[in-house]
């Protein structure tokens, strides 16, 4: 049996070598302890150096955002599954503020508010990351709105036009077509996208907050079937998600849009809807024991929306002249636009389209109430052709609404009032439009000219939509030069008007109303004078009879 020999020289040499190479570089890591957790909120004790909006890591890789920084604890919103978070668990700092990945690879995808794909189509290779809380462009970094963003909806493009960089509020009760208006606007950008010209292309972002999962799936399917998903990103925080996700989703969409805007590109973002975001933020604030204000909303709920919507802008030429156009949606109750959140967002935005339940139930769709709807800056972006043909449209519709209410009580109306009622009824019918069928702007100009130019006065009200569709088909086939001229020059010249009038008159000869009658307007010939009477006309001036 061999004996074990221990060499003291070898041992001392090994120790000396270890000491020589030893590096006393201790790592310092702040560890917090969960003091209580529940309903998507966790209070963490410790972490004295934590920053506001910093990401914290819970066991299992679940992330949270530090919102409340108290003396002894940190109020954290948990992003993800909070069921497994328990009292006594350790929490680590990440040293990073909340950010999301951005880039062109997100087009055509459905993501959650953390930028992670949820459509089952694999990972997304991001170009870079962008912090959610970034300052909006300053005054000198902006320019005034001057380029139109066509929605494809006649009632909006003619009376409340939207420009690139504008914030136009879509407001109304539930089930009045608010989402449909925004989806039609996204679909209408397809023609510009297919040109391949970056100056015309508009990238779209649809942010779904608190919607049903089936509703988000239906929107995605609609966009996919229309070929619009290739230039659209959907940020989804459905009703089943935690309040933290619903609060963050609009900021995620905005960060993605700002990334493209600062590259000189044009972006359209839809927030559907900000009422549910405010409710989620209210829930978070109450759980964090922040003092409630009006309608139990926290004091900074105005700032919640203002700092989000102020990011929509038309950048100056020095910064690339990109734009971010916002369409926030607000849901009202019983058409009450004087409630807290509606008045807040109305004061922040550049105009609003008010959708009314009564109009919707009457079959006027889109149910835009012209009297309350307004666009404060979009008029500067409206093309001249539309301004010319639609200039009198708002006034005529307003007069029609007043007369309509008066006519319900008056049995006898003068000829002028009757003519206004007849014209107004045809204009209302003309502005009706099926869902998911946006109109190119040149066809909108032609259609609205039919109404404001008096060419529909001889067409029965029930035949107006059919007349419009068949006439547009006729113009596309036989008078494509008229549409091309309006599209290219963006003007409605006298020559174009003459051509269009002749085309309408010729088309009326072949169009038959539902009852089989003709809609052609035939002039009434005056009775001819005898030869002896020609040149014998006299003017007689008579004094009034003296008063007795």
Swiss-Prot record:
The keyword Phosphoprotein does not apply. One of its GO terms (cellular component) is proton-transporting ATP synthase complex. It catalyses: ATP + H2O + 4 H(+)(in) = ADP + phosphate + 5 H(+)(out). Keywords: ATP synthesis, ATP-binding, Cell membrane, CF(1), Hydrogen ion transport, Ion transport, Membrane, Nucleotide-binding, Translocase, Transport. SUPFAM superfamilies: C-terminal domain of alpha and beta subunits of F1 ATP synthase, N-terminal domain of alpha and beta subunits of F1 ATP synthase, P-loop containing nucleoside triphosphate hydrolases. InterPro entries: ATP_synth_asu-like_sf, ATP_synth_asu_C, ATP_synth_asu_C_sf, ATP_synth_F1_a_nt-bd_dom, ATP_synth_F1_asu, ATPase_a/bsu_AS, ATPase_F1/V1/A1_a/bsu_N, ATPase_F1/V1/A1_a/bsu_N_sf. The record marks 373 as: Required for activity. The keyword Hydrolase does not apply. GO terms for molecular function: ADP binding; ATP binding; proton-transporting ATP synthase activity, rotational mechanism. ATP binds at residues 172-179. Its EC number is 7.1.2.2. Pfam families: ATP-synt_ab, ATP-synt_ab_C, ATP-synt_ab_N. Its main location: membrane. It is a peripheral membrane protein. It is found in: Cell membrane. Belongs to the ATPase alpha/beta chains family. F-type ATPases have 2 components, CF(1) - the catalytic core - and CF(0) - the membrane proton channel. CF(1) has five subunits: alpha(3), beta(3), gamma(1), delta(1), epsilon(1). CF(0) has three main subunits: a(1), b(2) and c(9-12). The alpha and beta chains form an alternating ring which encloses part of the gamma chain. CF(1) is attached to CF(0) by a central stalk formed by the gamma and epsilon chains, while a peripheral stalk is formed by the delta and b chains. Produces ATP from ADP in the presence of a proton gradient across the membrane. The alpha chain is a regulatory subunit. This is ATP synthase subunit alpha.
């Amino acid at each position: 049996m061999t004996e074990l020999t221990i060499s003291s020289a070898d041992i001392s040499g090994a120790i000396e070598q270890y000491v020589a190479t030893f590096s006393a570089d201790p790592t310092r890591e702040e560890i917090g302890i969960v003091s209580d957790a529940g309903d998507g909120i966790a209070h963490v004790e410790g972490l004295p150096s934590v920053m506001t909006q910093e990401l914290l890591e819970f066991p299992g890789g679940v992330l949270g955002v530090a919102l409340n920084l108290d003396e002894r604890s940190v109020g954290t919103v948990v992003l993800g599954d909070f069921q497994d978070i328990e009292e006594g668990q350790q929490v680590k700092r990440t040293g990073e503020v909340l950010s999301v990945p951005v880039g062109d690879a997100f087009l055509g995808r459905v993501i959650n508010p953390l930028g992670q794909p949820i459509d089952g189509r694999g990972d997304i290779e991001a170009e870079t990351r962008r912090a959610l809380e970034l300052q909006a462009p300053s005054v000198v970094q902006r320019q005034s709105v001057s380029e139109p963003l066509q929605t494809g909806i006649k009632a909006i493009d003619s009376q409340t036009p939207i420009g690139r960089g504008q914030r136009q509020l879509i407001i109304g009760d539930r089930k009045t077509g608010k989402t449909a208006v925004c989806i039609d606007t996204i679909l209408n950008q397809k023609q510009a996208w297919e040109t391949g010209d970056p100056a015309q292309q508009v990238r779209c972002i649809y942010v779904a907050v608190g919607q049903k999962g089936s509703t988000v799936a239906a929107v995605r399917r609609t966009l996919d079937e229309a070929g619009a998903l290739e230039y659209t990103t959907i940020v989804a925080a459905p009703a089943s998600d935690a309040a933290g996700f619903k609060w963050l989703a609009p900021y995620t969409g905005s960060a993605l849009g700002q990334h493209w805007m600062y590259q000189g590109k044009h972006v359209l973002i839809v927030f559907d809807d900000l009422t549910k975001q405010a409710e989620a933020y209210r829930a978070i604030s109450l759980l964090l024991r922040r003092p409630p204000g009006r309608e139990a909303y926290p004091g900074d709920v105005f700032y919640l929306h203002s700092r989000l919507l102020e990011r929509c802008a038309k950048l100056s030429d020095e910064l690339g002249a990109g734009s971010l156009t916002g369409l926030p949606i607000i849901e009202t109750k019983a058409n009450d636009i004087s409630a807290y959140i509606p008045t807040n967002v109305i004061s922040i935005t550049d105009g609003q389209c008010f959708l009314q339940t009564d109009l919707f139930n009457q079959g006027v769709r889109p149910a835009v109430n012209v009297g309350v709807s307004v666009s404060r800056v979009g008029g500067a972006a409206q093309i001249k052709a539309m301004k010319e043909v639609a200039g009198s449209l708002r006034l005529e519709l307003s007069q029609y609404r007043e007369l309509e209410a008066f006519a319900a009580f008056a049995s006898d109306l003068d000829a002028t009032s009757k003519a206004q009622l007849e014209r107004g009824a045809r204009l209302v019918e003309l502005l009706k439009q099926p869902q998911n069928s946006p109109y190119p702007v040149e066809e909108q100009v032609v259609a609205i000219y039919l109404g404001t130019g008096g060419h529909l006065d001889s067409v029965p009200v029930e035949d107006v939509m059919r007349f419009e569709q068949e006439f547009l088909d006729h113009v596309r086939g036989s008078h494509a030069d008229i549409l091309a001229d309006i599209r290219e020059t963006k003007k409605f010249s006298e020559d174009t008007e003459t051509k269009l009038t002749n085309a309408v008159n010729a088309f009326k000869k072949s169009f038959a109303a539902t009852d089989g009658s003709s809609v052609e307007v035939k002039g009434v010939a005056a009775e001819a004078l005898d030869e002896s009477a020609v040149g014998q006309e006299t003017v007689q001036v008579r004094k009034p009879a003296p008063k007795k």
